[in-house]
Amino acid sequence: MAHTKSKAVLILYTVCFSAFFASLSQNIYSPILPIIKESFHVSTAMVNLSVSVFMIVTAIMQIILGAIIDFKGARIVLITGILATAAASIGCAVTTDFTLFLIFRMIQAAGSAALPLIAATTIGQLFTGNERGSAMGTYQMLLSVAPAIAPVLGGFIGGAAGYEGIFWILAAISIVLLVTNSITFPKDSPTESMQQAKGNVFAHYKSIFTNRTGNVILTLSFVLFFIYFAVIVYLPILLTEHYHIDVGIAGLLYLPLALSTIAGTFLFKRIQAKIGLHTLFIGSNVIAACSIILFAVTHSVSLVLMALTLALFGISMGVIPPLYSTMITNEFEHNRGSAIGMFNFIRYTGMAAGPMVSAYLLTMMPSAMSFSLLGLGFAALSFCLLPPMFSPQKRTKQKKHHM
């Protein structure tokens, strides 16, 4: 994929805004859950199911689509995904049957799941070295902004135009993205497709799991996103039950985490070329582990101290995802789609498991002990996995796969 710098930048922002839209589609839905329940006359459990299936489908599609991208190319997956998202959004807007709504929501998840995956894969193809890290920071920054503004937009649009208004807007944006990507996104090179097709899907995933760097990043990303969502889900309970803060005001206390995450991605863009990915890898994991332990110590003592530790945690969560993504794309040049797909799948699995397992832990022991164990566990895991990752033999398997 040879492109001029201006063309590469145009493609970068097109796929990054497409990924931003995918995150928007997921997070804009939360504020209208009461409207969905009332409009379709269904139980809270059924409404929550519509949230869960979206995440489950998104996670599963990462593995499926990653392999398809490697063997068939990204453009066909991108265009098909946006078409599916547009059609499903229209279906969600017009249907009056909740079962059909659920099916359309699943199709929407399958379509939009392709967009962040293709963005990360395309960045790996268009950029190398420090430029790749900077581009990955841009990608992650837009992904970080979406969860911060999507609930606000969802509440505003849902209040003014109902849930239908949200899905009509998502459909309209999908059509704009379809046109834009059709014009700007490059056609897949036949020679690249033939080169990639020499392997098979099992060989691609085997190379990921037998690669030391891949194993370390996948393991740490699962644990980190497990902890991140355990904290996210626990916060409203802590704020309302321990500090007796109104739910509306409690939402504002997510801002330190959201804003510092955005700041962390910006920081990654600025420093990744200066200090090196391996040094940044060690430092960001140390900061993440320390901030989790500090949260365990401070969360029930002081709102101010808790906000500061959340801000520190947010900075590490802004740095680590683009860092891990960059290292994955650097490590797996010939099966990049499969590797990024597996990385995203592991992240989503951690997100889903964190709230469930942490809820059980909180019934067994005090919250301070629960989060201390999680923080110490992440620190110990990082310490144990770093030496194998930096072993000089870590690239052997990947080289064999490249042939």
Swiss-Prot record:
Instruction: Give GO cellular component annotations, separated by semicolons.
Output: plasma membrane
- Provide this UniProt record's keywords sorted from A to Z: Cell membrane, Membrane, Transmembrane, Transmembrane helix, Transport
Q: Which GO terms describe its molecular function?
A: transmembrane transporter activity
Q: Which residues form a coiled coil?
A: none
Localization terms from the record: Cell membrane
Look up keyword Transmembrane helix and say if it applies: yes
**Presence of the UniProt keyword DNA repair in the record:** no
InterPro entries tied to this protein: MFS (IPR011701), MFS_dom (IPR020846), MFS_Efflux_Transporters (IPR050189), MFS_trans_sf (IPR036259)
List where the protein spans the membrane: 8-28, 49-69, 76-96, 100-120, 137-157, 159-179, 217-237, 248-268, 275-295, 303-323, 349-369, 370-390
What's an example Gene Ontology biological process for this entry?
transmembrane transport
The membrane-topology field of this record reads: Multi-pass membrane protein
Alphabetized PANTHER family for the sequence: CHLORAMPHENICOL EFFLUX PUMP RV0191, PURINE EFFLUX PUMP PBUE
What is stated as this protein's family in its record? Belongs to the major facilitator superfamily. TCR/Tet family.
For this entry, the protein name equals Uncharacterized MFS-type transporter YvmA
Please tell me the species this chain comes from: Bacillus subtilis (strain 168)
> Upper lineage ranks?
Bacteria, Bacillati, Bacillota, Bacilli, Bacillales
Q: Which gene encodes it?
A: yvmA
